[in-house]
């Protein structure tokens, strides 16, 4: 069924929802409130992102935090990926973890992980990216 009231926008307000949902594979790091996000996993996230980039797999962040807060967070944690913006209630409904990781294949949820259970890239590659 179609998803209603779900939008992903860029910093400049451009709606990129359709683009994201059409991607072959895309990881979404969902952090509904970036300031309350568990920061202890950022090193692991950055390593995962690096491996995604080497393998040509898309990786983006989704948050409802203000753009200035996001830029400050990205700079502080050397995040090598872009954050996009979605309603906070929608993000909490998607995954009950801050942050949480989701894998979409052409808009279909293939995997979801709480930050305590983030997989390694090799695990994901062997199970989901065939």
Region roles according to the model:
Residues 4-9, 16-37:
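Short active-site neighborhood of thiol/selenol oxidoreductases, capturing the structured segment around
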Residues 6, 99-113:
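A short, hydrophobic beta-strand/beta-hairpin element that forms part of a small beta-sheet core
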Residues 27-29, 61, 103:
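Structural beta-sheet core signal
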Residues 30-34, 63-65, 114-115:
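Structural motif
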Residues 37-74:
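Structural microenvironment flanking redox-active thiols in thiol-disulfide oxidoreductases
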Residues 59-62, 75-98:
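Short, internal strand/loop/helix patches
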Residues 108-130:
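Thiol-/selenol-based redox modules, centered on thioredoxin-like
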